[in-house]
Regions:
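Boundary/entry segment of secreted carbohydrate-active catalytic domains
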Residues: 29-71
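Substrate-binding cleft and catalytic face of glycoside hydrolase catalytic domains
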Residues: 58-221, 236-237
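C-terminal motif of bacterial Sec signal peptides marking the signal peptidase cleavage site
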Residues: 18-21
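Bacterial signal peptide processing site
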Residues: 23-25
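Noncatalytic carbohydrate-binding groove/subsite architecture in carbohydrate-active enzymes
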Residues: 35-37, 52, 131, 135-159, ...
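N-terminal export leaders
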Residues: 1-6
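Aromatic-rich peripheral "rim/lid" segments of glycoside hydrolase catalytic domains that contact
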Residues: 162-167, 172, 288-303, 313-368
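Hydrophobic faces of well-ordered beta-strands that scaffold small-molecule active sites
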Residues: 40-46, 66-68, 101-105, 164-168, ...
């Protein structure tokens, strides 16, 4: 395929990479145009790797950004050696479809900690290795990065899509993602160093706090507002934080808006001018799933329409920079989340759900 040939040439052009083709035989052709009226504002957080037809449909429907799980443990599976091949393929595909990556960087390799959810802040060598990895990632994929320079040699017509924002970790107020227990002070240190590293390479990039759900259901969890306040208590955080991530999962629209409002109020209270970014929001569409986030398909569509519409109406007031829906397609990935398997905008057969129609009504995109 054309993409496979391009990735093969990138293996030669970008030092230190071994790049396979990314699995599709489709000729990517010209860059897809993002449909609708909002460019990269609306995004998707997929729970599986979408195929090219998915990406084309997303883009036509007004999805202009894509939440990328940038896993340190995947890239540095062997201590001291980076394998970027999976992400070279992913960033290339997104650029071919005109979509902006929004990476959240997470996952400590087993060479440094026994669990990927144990942060690298406990050990100076691990913390240095994190900084080295993050620097390498931004040098590769950031503005004027090595990857985009190599792509331009092979395909000068392809428009680069470097991340506008880098999100540091995921839900660190939950012990699911921050073992053994959430620690706002340690997260502040992780964030501050990460911000310094990223801006040292790409001064125009935004560095965003991890999206947090206000009240995680895990042992030792910390309310996201309390957690964020303790992070801001550290010297230099207002300069380090460019945007604040929010995961306002809630059973109804009022609770969604309440979480966003409380986060915005805290940012204003501490005197920061950081924007907000909803990096995950969603509901399931199987009411038998046993969760207050499990609705009917019609209710899922209505909640999407009302919550995203209300947030859009208050975009300037809230300093809202983006909204990312979880997720694209109904698929059971085996995670311990009863409603997640039906959180898609399309069903398992990729047929439109009421939520996809509501989404494209909002964006002005094409649902087909």
């Amino acid at each position: 395929s054309r993409r496979g040939a391009l990735l093969a040439s990138l293996a030669v052009l970008v030092a230190g990479s071994a790049l396979p083709g990314c699995g599709g035989d489709e000729d990517p052709g010209e860059t897809t145009t993002i449909g609708g009226d909002y460019g990269a504002f609306f995004g998707i957080a997929p729970n599986e790797t979408p195929d090219d037809s998915d990406l084309v449909r997303m883009a036509r429907g007004g999805i202009g950004s894509y939440h990328v799980l940038l896993s340190w443990q995947t890239v540095e599976a062997v201590k001291g050696a980076y394998d970027w091949s999976a992400y070279d393929a992913e960033f290339l595909r997104l650029a071919e479809h005109g979509m902006e990556p929004v990476p959240y960087v997470i996952g400590t390799p087993t060479a440094y900690e026994k669990s990927s959810s144990i942060p690298p802040t406990n050990d100076p060598k691990a913390f240095d290795a994190w900084a080295d990895f993050l620097k390498a990632a931004v040098e590769r994929y950031g503005t004027n990065g090595q990857f985009w320079a190599a792509v331009a040699q092979s395909n000068p017509d392809l428009v680069p899509q470097p991340p506008r924002a880098w999100e540091i970790w995921n839900e660190p107020n939950s012990s699911v993602f921050w073992e053994p227990a959430p620690d706002p002070d340690a997260y502040a240190e992780l964030f501050k160093r990460s911000s310094r590293v990223i801006k040292g390479v790409d001064p125009e990039a935004e560095v965003m706090t991890a999206g947090m759900f206000i009240t995680p259901q895990s042992e030792g969890a910390i309310n996201s507002i309390d957690f964020l306040r303790q992070v801001y208590d550290h010297r230099g955080m207002k300069d380090a934080i460019d945007a604040v991530g929010v995961h306002p999962y809630a059973p109804d629209v009022d609770d969604v808006l309440d979480q966003v409002d409380k986060t915005h109020a805290l940012v204003e209270e501490v005197g920061d001018d950081a924007g907000l970014w909803v990096t995950e929001i969603g509901w399931g569409s199987n009411p038998r799933a046993g969760s207050d986030l499990a609705k009917t398909p019609e209710e899922q569509g209505q909640l999407l329409s009302e919550s995203l519409g209300d947030l859009l109406d208050r975009l300037d007031e809230l300093g809202l920079e983006g909204i990312i829906w979880f997720t694209w397609r109904d698929v059971d990935t085996g995670v311990e989340c009863t409603w997640c398997a039906t959180a898609g905008l399309v069903d398992g057969d990729r047929d439109s759900k009421p939520s996809w129609i509501a989404f494209t009504d909002l964006t002005g995109g094409d649902p087909d």
